[in-house]
UniProtKB/Swiss-Prot annotation:
Annotated HAMAP family: UvrC
Positions of the UVR domain: 196-231
Gene3D superfamilies noted in UniProt: 5' to 3' exonuclease, C-terminal subdomain, GIY-YIG endonuclease, UVR domain, UvrC, RNAse H endonuclease domain
Similarity comment text for this entry: Belongs to the UvrC family.
Subcellular location: Cytoplasm
Quaternary structure note: Interacts with UvrB in an incision complex.
Presence of keyword Manganese: no
One Gene Ontology term, aspect cellular component: cytoplasm
Biological role stated in the UniProt entry: The UvrABC repair system catalyzes the recognition and processing of DNA lesions. UvrC both incises the 5' and 3' sides of the lesion. The N-terminal half is responsible for the 3' incision and the C-terminal half is responsible for the 5' incision.
Name of a matching Pfam family: GIY-YIG
Source organism superkingdom: Bacteria
Protein name: UvrABC system protein C
Length: 594
């Protein structure tokens, strides 16, 4: 804890409000709320914490706080601050999960559409549906029953659907608003589960067609009735009152929270949402934050009613969500919340079981790898790869795996400084020397195993530096690829030999992951350096444009193509003198005109 934090802790009030933890760069990394700011914020810097909270605290270099008039105000402010700042330690809803809805547009001639985007005052939305297939099947059925406009053609033109009897836009006068209002009302009734009237109408039409011996039309009506019945049976009835509601349940264990939401529409369970995340405060408080964020996301329509667990304060939920908030006390409704809670518990337990299984497999792979090589269990592995094109922009990269998992904070990049031309062995010698001379002289953690991407030449070069130049004793292995650039074999020992390793073993999969990761990291770095060098070299002859200004341009425009499209004003906004900016702009303009 630094002196700034110590001083600020003394100034905290005994009031409700929000606090914002910041890292050394001033970036907000966590937003929280508290009934008592003094007690809550101080708790981070006192006593022991679990691993995830210790990680958060280790990054806190400063904090701010905002006093509010009540706990409810603090909750609302917290949700807004999280949305605005997106702190890395706060709950993040899955951004890849958007459900399909059926939409009736509010155009003069309404259309039925499937969409994943909800826009206010843009029509009526029904759903969500569990997947695109289900939504499409429902829409197909609606298209056959209700003659909405199906295309964007002008209404004075007859379309294909008109001939199928599935579109009446051409025949109904656009001034007949009552017709379209009635049609929309029928669809709303149908999608809200009140489809008895529709079925009765279809049965009447089927009998009428049959009496007229129009058997094809009668069969069409029969199939529509059958389609409605099928749609009914595919949805599980969870509530007899046919109400639209979302049902929340949550469970906490080992510093993690799982929230399950059942989407119930017209008494039928149509989908569920599952989210798991670490929590840092009281479970009830983080659950409230989750609910606020959940409904702030436009992908989630607010139903008429929301069921919550009995441990949650319904007045706080009502303050952030404009719906009827219910804490069921008995019967079927209480069982629904219990079911959501049970599912949350099962999901969280499955997560822990999978993590434990993965940990056992990885730990076993590391231990077995050590046995195969005749060394101690290689808990920390450092792997190296070189990257260049015909010796240009040569770089190298190091990745670190601890307990079989990447430790990205320990990754390192190297620009090759002493090697001229494409010499992979010399490049490896330079990088190994630079890395482990620092390890030796600065007392950094020594790895249990070094892996180099390459064959005998790379391994011998690395081992020679480690043993003879630095006098260290660290095992060095090599990973060779085949002609398809895939992990092929492991080299180790003195003399070097291929280590027999089954392709379907966990040890092989671990080595494959390590080799892929170091290759990815090296290639990415090489592309960045090459792009930067190419960008810089094209601007070398412009007077007044030195390395710092080139760096400014690269940071702002990212590529030469983007810079060539920039205006003179955009270039000058970076603080580049007018004469230099004009010279650069003239150069770029003349180049683009060639």
């Amino acid at each position: 804890m630094n002196e700034l934090i110590k001083h600020k802790l003394e100034l905290l009030p005994d009031s409700p409000g929000c606090y914002l933890h910041k890292d050394k760069a001033g970036t907000i990394i966590y937003v929280g709320k508290a009934k008592n700011l003094r007690n809550r914020v101080r708790s981070y810097f006192r006593g022991s914490h679990d691993t995830k909270t210790e990680l958060l605290v280790s990054e806190i270099a400063d904090f701010e706080f905002i006093v509010t008039g009540s706990n409810t105000e603090a909750l609302l402010l917290e949700i807004n601050l999280i949305q605005e700042n997106m702190p890395k330690y706060n709950i993040k809803l899955k951004d890849d999960k958007s459900y399909p809805f059926i939409k009736i547009t509010n155009e003069p001639f309404p259309r039925l559409l499937i969409t994943r985007q909800i826009k206010k005052n843009d029509g009526l939305y029904f759903g969500p549906y569990p997947d695109a297939y289900t939504a499409t099947e429902v829409k197909k059925l609606l298209d056959r029953i209700f003659p909405f406009k199906k295309c964007k053609n002008p209404v004075n033109k007859v379309c294909f659907y008109y001939h199928l009897g599935q579109c009446q836009a051409h025949t109904i006068c656009h001034t007949d608003k009552a017709y379209w209002d009635s049609l929309v009302a029928d669809v709303k009734q149908f999608l809200n589960g009140k489809d008895d009237k529709i079925i009765d109408d279809l049965r009447s039409k089927m009998l009428e067609a049959s009496n007229k011996q129009e058997f094809e039309r009668a069969a069409e009506y029969r199939d529509l009735i059958s389609g409605i019945a099928t749609m009914r049976t595919k949805q599980r009835v969870m509530s007899k009152d046919l109400q639209d509601r979302d049902i929340f349940g949550y469970f906490v264990d080992k510093g993690w929270m799982c929230v399950q939401v059942f989407f119930v529409r017209q008494g039928k369970l149509i989908q569920r949402d599952v989210n798991m995340f670490p929590y840092y405060n009281e479970a009830e408080e983080d659950f409230l934050t989750y609910v606020g964020q959940f409904y702030s996301d436009q992908r989630h329509l607010i139903p008429k009613e929301i069921f919550i667990p009995e441990t949650i304060d319904e007045t706080l939920v009502a303050a952030i969500v404009p719906a009827r908030i219910v804490k069921p006390q008995r019967g079927e409704k209480k069982q629904l919340v219990a079911l959501a809670t049970k599912n949350a518990r099962v999901s969280l337990q499955q997560k822990f079981d999978l993590l434990e299984k993965d940990l056992r497999k990885t730990s076993g792979a590391i231990e077995h790898l050590g046995q195969l090589l005749g060394i101690e269990k290689p808990v920390r592995i450092e792997a190296f790869d070189n990257s260049n094109i015909q010796g240009t922009s040569p770089v190298a990269a190091m990745v670190v795996f601890v307990d079989g998992k990447p430790s990205k904070k320990d990754y390192r990049k190297f620009k090759i400084k002493t090697v001229i031309g494409p010499d992979d062995y010399a490049s490896m010698r330079e990088v190994i020397y630079r890395r482990y001379s620092r390890v030796k002289h600065e007392g950094l953690q020594v790895p249990d195993l070094i892996i180099v991407d390459g064959g005998q030449g790379q391994v011998k070069a690395a081992r020679d530096v480690i043993e003879h130049q630095l006098g260290l004793s660290i095992p060095v292995a090599g990973l060779q690829k085949n002609d398809k650039h895939q992990t092929h074999e492991l080299l180790f020992g003195n003399p070097l030999a291929v280590v027999e390793l089954p392709r379907n073993s966990e040890e092989f999969f671990l080595l494959h992951r390590i080799q892929d990761e170091v290759h990815r990291f090296a290639i990415t770095f090489h592309r960045q350096v090459r792009s930067k060098n190419a960008f810089s070299s094209k601007l070398d002859h412009i007077a007044g444009l030195g390395p710092k200004r080139k760096q400014l341009l690269l940071k702002r425009f990212k590529s030469m193509t983007a810079l060539e499209q920039a205006s003179l004003e955009e270039i000058q906004q970076l603080g580049i003198p007018k004469t230099v900016a004009e010279a650069l702009f003239d150069h770029l303009t003349s180049k683009s005109e060639v």
